[in-house]
Amino acid sequence: MSLLSLPWLGLRPVATSPWLLLLLVVGSWLLARILAWTYAFYNNCRRLQCFPQPPKRNWFWGHLGLITPTEEGLKNSTQMSATYSQGFTVWLGPIIPFIVLCHPDTIRSITNASAAIAPKDNLFIRFLKPWLGEGILLSGGDKWSRHRRMLTPAFHFNILKSYITIFNKSANIMLDKWQHLASEGSSRLDMFEHISLMTLDSLQKCIFSFDSHCQERPSEYIATILELSALVEKRSQHILQHMDFLYYLSHDGRRFHRACRLVHDFTDAVIRERRRTLPTQGIDDFFKDKAKSKTLDFIDVLLLSKDEDGKALSDEDIRAEADTFMFGGHDTTASGLSWVLYNLARHPEYQERCRQEVQELLKDRDPKEIEWDDLAQLPFLTMCVKESLRLHPPAPFISRCCTQDIVLPDGRVIPKGITCLIDIIGVHHNPTVWPDPEVYDPFRFDPENSKGRSPLAFIPFSAGPRNCIGQAFAMAEMKVVLALMLLHFRFLPDHTEPRRKLELIMRAEGGLWLRVEPLNVSLQ
């Protein structure tokens, strides 16, 4: 037993135990951490004063409840972007600040920063990790850089060309369903429901060369993909379920675990089968067989990819990238197509001009087949797609965590450790960037009108090193499907105005309903 004596404080020697010493050490450590955090917090508050701040609800809630994933919340967000057009600070409660950037000049420093300086913030997308693994969406550092380089050939134009046939087939299956429904008197359809199923059908063929006929009959795999997306979205809205140990004890957590296992088993089975086929045939014979079918699918490209050192991707890596493509490719494209149909339904003059452009292009040709070279011959349709993506970007926000101080062009500094929100919808609705931003005007994207505009004024697929690797795939699919839809149907507004709803992507509450009228297709 040691004696603790502090005579200079007038205290008598007292006996001390190891527990008391441990308590003193732990207490001192906690006090030091609290003081360090307090200093850093107030230092950041001081440094953030250069960013304006919208009025809070109160000191405790901060701006919580003002920016919500609802129509009202999105309106509040775009209003803030209009008022504070160079960016602003919002507080999630009393101690968590975010910097919201909503102008091309201010987002440039973040989007152009390396993935090491401004990596993705994993606050919510970490819920996807048990499903998507260390794919390109969730990985970071050297692994992300290596995978990004190895995946780039999978989205080369020569590969994308072969997917056009798949886009045509999947779109025509959906349009035949619509013809059948219209003949039975059902002219009011939820665009999200039908188009999501069509994009999943296309992706399953492009990634796995597998046709589940999911648009014609139920598919367990496709139903599981939809279930996983819904469970991730539901989890993000319940604070207690953010803790893994609580979530996986819940009914939803067990459902999520089972669904992940089913999806992984499907992907693993495809990879194993290809691994068996490849060494048996040899690479040359493998390519010859693929040339006959005119399709080199995503799994094929990943199996054949090698990095600078000649190393291939592991089966686990291939599964992660295939599952990531399946997740990232269906909802975003479905959102983009659904909203462009909504905008064209509200502007029949633009819809008719797009239709005439497609009719002229396909004159004396098969009205159910769009070819790769046709995509460059649809300038007005492309302008309409881009203007819809401006008004209704599928992913309205992207978050980045600053690992070091980042200096903006105007001299303001975003402190290290602060999370930045790249407000894509704010940039797209910023009146200092886009005059009359709420008006749907495809002519904004006329080449003459685009001269001098910042490339960061329009970023539906993000920008910089971590932009969407599949954007060419998405644009090609949207243009093919939209051309075929406009050729065979007229789209009219529903009697109810949709209310935007932000989930994993931009949706509409209760679905996005439009009325469809079959057209008599004659291109002679």
From Swiss-Prot:
Show the GO MF annotations: alkane 1-monooxygenase activity; arachidonate epoxygenase activity; heme binding; iron ion binding; leukotriene-B4 20-monooxygenase activity; monooxygenase activity
- Pathway participation: Lipid metabolism; arachidonate metabolism
Q: Which keywords does this chain's UniProt record carry?
A: Endoplasmic reticulum, Fatty acid metabolism, Heme, Iron, Lipid metabolism, Membrane, Metal-binding, Microsome, Monooxygenase, Oxidoreductase, Transmembrane, Transmembrane helix
Known catalysed reaction(s)? an organic molecule + reduced [NADPH--hemoprotein reductase] + O2 = an alcohol + oxidized [NADPH--hemoprotein reductase] + H2O + H(+); (5Z,8Z,11Z,14Z)-eicosatetraenoate + reduced [NADPH--hemoprotein reductase] + O2 = 18-hydroxy-(5Z,8Z,11Z,14Z)-eicosatetraenoate + oxidized [NADPH--hemoprotein reductase] + H2O + H(+); (7Z,10Z,13Z,16Z,19Z)-docosapentaenoate + reduced [NADPH--hemoprotein reductase] + O2 = 10,11-epoxy-(7Z,13Z,16Z,19Z)-docosatetraenoate + oxidized [NADPH--hemoprotein reductase] + H2O + H(+); (7Z,10Z,13Z,16Z,19Z)-docosapentaenoate + reduced [NADPH--hemoprotein reductase] + O2 = 13,14-epoxy-(7Z,10Z,16Z,19Z)-docosatetraenoate + oxidized [NADPH--hemoprotein reductase] + H2O + H(+)
Annotated Pfam families: p450
**Positions that bind heme:** C468
Designated name of the protein = Cytochrome P450 4F12
Organism field: Homo sapiens
